[in-house]
């Protein structure tokens, strides 16, 4: 494996340097994406940029919302894996870096970390205005015009490295590599942030982190949830018997060590409560071994199937520290409350007693106590739906368009 990684890094570096000024045709792996420098492409009025499109998460849902807000805007990104992210991206024009030609790095984007400063710096975005969705890389792309940076978080692998890697991977190849190149990454990241005048945070927690890390005072635009109130639901094949009674708790998360999925499993095992986990990630095998007969773990489902899982659950468990955390809003669209960790973005989206209840620490003991105490009859479904409507995609699109209009007007006036 290490030899494959080393070969991929060497090969990718050569690709980036030798191909950065060339244009490639649409690739089969990332249809209709184009892998190349974009020097010959006519500059659009507006473009969208994002770190990489290789997974299904809240940041990727924000990019989908940006695509719906600006459907003609091309999306620039370092890596794109169609089968790994949301299928709706297949309808977008996606332009990738030369790094996308290395299959191993598309599948395991963390292996690309040492190459991403160079890759990002070489990825030209020739647009008059760019809306940049970033967790640490896209704000360093090579922009030719104005940019509005929508920040999900300053780079976690720099400023929250232990959380990003998890205890078991601190001394892994990637963990050691990050420590070695930390000064280079910090220099690159701080310089990229300094070149970006117009920042927006996605939550109060990120607003505070941007102030601490970059010294910027920025406004907030809350991200949207994927509305489920009017969506047609589709049962998940093979789970009808498990979910039919509507007596299960739901957890929707990437299966990473810092997400505390193991604590939720232990809590439900002890309490004898059903738990449906939707997500994928490197911790899956470990979590399967930990799970009792009351737990199911699934992944790769459609939005309609996700909607069905939300509608028929007792409540959502949201027990990791999230910078914003969209899942409580997705649950709320179906009138479902949340048992959440009192931290981070959940403080923006959960009003205690209305659409959720808090635990003080994400331990199995506190999760167990909360699910034993939980009574579904105490929650008003319609009140929950009314509350989370303020986080709708329509509201997000209106606020983003207004921010872009203000940026364009400011640029035109020379202010």
Question: Which residue stretches match the model-derived regions?
Answer:
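Active-site donor-binding segments of glycosyltransferases and PAPS-dependent sulfotransferases
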Residues: 69-137
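Conserved donor-binding/catalytic core segment of Leloir-type glycosyltransferases
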Residues: 225, 240-259, 265-276
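Acidic donor-binding loop of glycosyltransferase active sites
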Residues: 311-323, 336
């Amino acid at each position: 494996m290490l030899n494959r990684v080393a070969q991929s890094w060497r090969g990718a570096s050569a690709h980036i340097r030798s191909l950065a000024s060339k244009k490639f045709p649409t690739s089969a792996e990332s249809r209709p994406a184009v892998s190349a420098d974009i020097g010959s492409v006519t500059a659009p009025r507006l473009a969208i940029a994002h770190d990489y499109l290789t997974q299904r998460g809240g940041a990727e849902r924000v990019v989908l919302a940006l695509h719906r807000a600006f459907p003609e805007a091309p999306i620039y990104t370092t890596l794109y894996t169609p089968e790994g992210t949301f299928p709706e991206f297949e309808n977008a024009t996606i332009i990738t870096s030369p790094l996308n030609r290395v299959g191993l790095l598309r599948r395991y984007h963390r292996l690309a970390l040492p190459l991403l400063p160079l890759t990002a710096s070489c990825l030209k975005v020739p647009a008059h205005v760019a809306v940049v969705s970033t967790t640490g890389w896209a704000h360093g792309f090579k922009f030719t015009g104005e940019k509005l940076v929508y920040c999900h978080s300053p780079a976690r692998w720099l400023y929250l490295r232990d959380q990003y890697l998890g205890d078991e991977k601190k001394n892994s190849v990637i963990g050691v590599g990050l420590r070695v190149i930390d000064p280079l990454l910090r220099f690159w990241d701080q310089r990229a942030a300094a070149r970006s005048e117009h920042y927006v945070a996605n939550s109060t927690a990120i607003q505070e982190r941007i102030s601490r890390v970059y010294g910027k005072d920025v406004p907030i635009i809350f991200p949207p949830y994927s509305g489920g109130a009017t969506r047609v639901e589709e049962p998940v094949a093979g789970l009808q018997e498990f979910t039919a009674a509507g007596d299960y708790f739901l957890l929707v998360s990437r299966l990473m060590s810092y997400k505390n999925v193991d604590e939720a499993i232990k809590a439900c095992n002890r309490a004898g409560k059903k738990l449906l986990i939707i997500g994928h990630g490197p911790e899956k095998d470990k979590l399967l071994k930990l799970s009792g007969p009351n737990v199911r773990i699934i992944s790769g489902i459609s939005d309609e199937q996700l909607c069905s899982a939300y509608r028929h659950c007792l409540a959502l468990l949201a027990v990791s520290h999230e910078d914003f955390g969209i899942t409580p809003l997705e649950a709320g669209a179906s009138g479902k409350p949340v048992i959440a960790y009192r931290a981070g973005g959940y403080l923006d989206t959960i009003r205690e007693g209305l659409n959720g209840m808090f635990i003080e620490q994400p331990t199995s003991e506190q999760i167990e106590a909360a699910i034993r105490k939980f009574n579904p009859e105490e929650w008003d479904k319609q009140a929950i739906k009314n509350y989370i409507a303020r986080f709708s995609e329509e509201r997000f699109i209106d606020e983003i368009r207004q921010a872009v209009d203000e940026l364009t007007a400011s640029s035109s006036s020379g202010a």
